[in-house]
Amino acid sequence: MVLESTMVCVDNSEYMRNGDFLPTRLQAQQDAVNIVCHSKTRSNPENNVGLITLANDCEVLTTLTPDTGRILSKLHTVQPKGKITFCTGIRVAHLALKHRQGKNHKMRIIAFVGSPVEDNEKDLVKLAKRLKKEKVNVDIINFGEEEVNTEKLTAFVNTLNGKDGTGSHLVTVPPGPSLADALISSPILAGEGGAMLGLGASDFEFGVDPSADPELALALRVSMEEQRQRQEEEARRAAAASAAEAGIATTGTEDSDDALLKMTISQQEFGRTGLPDLSSMTEEEQIAYAMQMSLQGAEFGQAESADIDASSAMDTSEPAKEEDDYDVMQDPEFLQSVLENLPGVDPNNEAIRNAMGSLASQATKDGKKDKKEEDKK
């Protein structure tokens, strides 16, 4: 088995936001890096893998380590920003490989390029010659911007391979298919051993052989199960919300119908008593029932007469009250006292005195007339 130390260079430029690889270039790259890391560590437990970004000053996320979990945790913190500097990233990866612990390990760089390479072809060829001299192999996954980068990257890889034509690889992946699937079937992983060699993602569930990497297969299965449960929960909530909206009108109608039914029953129970079957009653029972009905009728009649007397008393009291008010208003002395208390009114005014005099004479005439009528009676 080959002992190898590998530095994985990931593209974290703004171009990785594009969705030509589902769901985005960045997430498709994460899946592919996951496969690369597990393939390298599975082929030989002593193999080491490191991680570096090509944008934002080419930051080394993890140094060489056999711990794939640490690498993947750092990988998922990468956010797209800026532009890549391909040559600088490859130089930093080469420097990290020089500090590997196992000096007998072969050196390899796997670079994911998903944005335009701005370095000119001359600089790329010069860098490739230096890496060939240092016996460093470079595999490049060219995706997303293959029309711009293919020519430059082909010259870079051909310079690395030299006359032998082996050791380094360039894999160009067109938009559409899964980046991870294309990588599995590519020559980059050929000869590394393990169950994933020569297999497509469709040969095993999630593209991983459970017997070769049970932990990864279990993690993928748990992730898919959680996603399925979330989707089912969202669908259940949406169905419940729509059912609740549709049931509001029906519930209101049922409630009103129930209330009407209860009201009808209560009216039937309390407002109207059922008539007894007289044919099934004895003569004594019929006499007792007749006496009871007559007593109820008498009570009802007394209540009605009391209501009538009360209403008639109210009617007779109202005219008497009106007559008392009229007599008070016709009293000259009362009016004179009222006028004296009103502000701005002069009781000695000639017009007011004439009006009061006519009112007094009218009251005298009415008094004499009432006296004559009483004498006649």
Curated annotation (Swiss-Prot):
Region called Essential for ubiquitin-binding, residue ranges: 216-220, 287-291
Source domain of life: Eukaryota
Xref: InterPro entries: PSMD4 (IPR027040), PSMD4_RAZUL-like (IPR049590), UIM_dom (IPR003903), VWF_A (IPR002035), vWFA_dom_sf (IPR036465)
Residues of the UIM domain: 211-230, 282-301
Sequence ranges assigned to domain VWFA in this UniProt record: 5-188
The protein's name: 26S proteasome non-ATPase regulatory subunit 4
CDD domains according to UniProt: PSMD4_RAZUL, VWA_26S_proteasome_subunit
One annotated GO biological process: proteasome-mediated ubiquitin-dependent protein catabolic process
Region spans: Interaction with UBQLN1: 197-262
Biased composition (Basic and acidic residues): 224-237, 365-377
Gene Ontology CC: one annotated term: nucleoplasm
SMART domains for the chain: UIM, VWA
Its biological purpose: Component of the 26S proteasome, a multiprotein complex involved in the ATP-dependent degradation of ubiquitinated proteins. This complex plays a key role in the maintenance of protein homeostasis by removing misfolded or damaged proteins, which could impair cellular functions, and by removing proteins whose functions are no longer required. Therefore, the proteasome participates in numerous cellular processes, including cell cycle progression, apoptosis, or DNA damage repair.
Organism listed in the record: Homo sapiens (Human)
Gene Ontology molecular function, alphabetical: identical protein binding; molecular adaptor activity; polyubiquitin modification-dependent protein binding; RNA binding
Gene: PSMD4
